[in-house]
């Protein structure tokens, strides 16, 4: 965009090209993974009443340590949802629920200016690294004086623990009615906190809301496989060999 000699006519043919956009959408559909579908809950092909609670994205630091403000939003815009289902204002009026959450985000992502190196947690609850190695030979940051970057005994806090709280609340409100979880994943996740609360789980990687609706409603079928293993626990993360593939104890769901 900074090139003053760009071919404007060629740009018009490429940017926003419907064919290219459709190809991109197809790839989004093919990237979503269904990791749980208890009693063949999905697809929900009939036009039903669905409860999709608002999600709170809490204030927190980005990778570059800029602070993003808190945001409360509807995961699926109304103009998209109305193509598939009727919107239920609460769990009482819903036939089923869809809860959107993000994978756990560790505060400061492994390094705190006061504490030094800290764990990166893959769970929502606070995690204290009691089983981490006592000595780590990877020095890391050249500005760090210590040659040992071990975080044994230190605690990691998850910024978006409210995602788990939201799911727990909706599960309680829905009672025996089905709950679908959409896990927007950026890190492998310890699933034992959320899997027992869900009847079906879709895992996506930065795709648009309509993709999930197409898959939940059965207009399209999920076909992707996980690109990572999902650990049984944080202890399993600590004990595995980072340089050995498929070396981690994976979570097994109720099915």
For the regions a language model picked out, list residue spans one by one.
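Long, well-ordered, tryptophan-enriched scaffold segments
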Residues: 1-4, 9
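C-terminal non-catalytic regions of proteins with extracellular/luminal or membrane-system context
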Residues: 8-9, 14-255
């Amino acid at each position: 965009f900074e090139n003053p000699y760009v071919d404007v006519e060629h740009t018009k043919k490429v940017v926003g090209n419907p064919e290219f956009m459709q190809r991109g959408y197809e790839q989004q559909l093919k990237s979503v993974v269904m990791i749980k579908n208890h009693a063949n809950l999905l697809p929900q092909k009939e036009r039903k009443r669905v409860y999709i609670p608002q999600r709170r994205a809490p204030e927190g630091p980005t990778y570059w340590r800029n602070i993003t403000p808190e945001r409360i939003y509807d995961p699926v815009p109304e103009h998209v949802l109305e193509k598939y289902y009727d919107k239920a204002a609460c769990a009482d009026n819903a036939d089923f629920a869809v809860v959107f959450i993000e994978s756990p985000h560790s505060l400061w992502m492994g390094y705190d200016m006061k504490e030094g190196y800290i764990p990166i947690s893959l769970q929502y609850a606070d995690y204290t690294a009691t089983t981490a190695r006592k000595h780590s030979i990877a020095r890391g940051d050249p500005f760090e004086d210590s040659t040992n970057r071990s975080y044994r005994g230190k605690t990691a806090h998850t910024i978006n623990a409210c995602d788990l709280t939201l799911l727990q609340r909706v599960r309680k409100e829905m009672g025996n009615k089905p709950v679908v979880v959409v896990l927007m994943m950026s890190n492998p996740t310890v699933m034992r906190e959320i899997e027992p609360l869900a009847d079906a789980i879709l895992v996506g990687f930065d795709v648009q809301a309509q993709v999930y609706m197409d898959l939940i409603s059965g207009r399209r079928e999920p076909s992707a496989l996980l690109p990572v293993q999902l650990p049984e626990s944080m202890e399993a993360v600590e004990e595995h060999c980072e340089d050995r593939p498929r070396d981690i104890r994976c979570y097994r769901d109720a099915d």
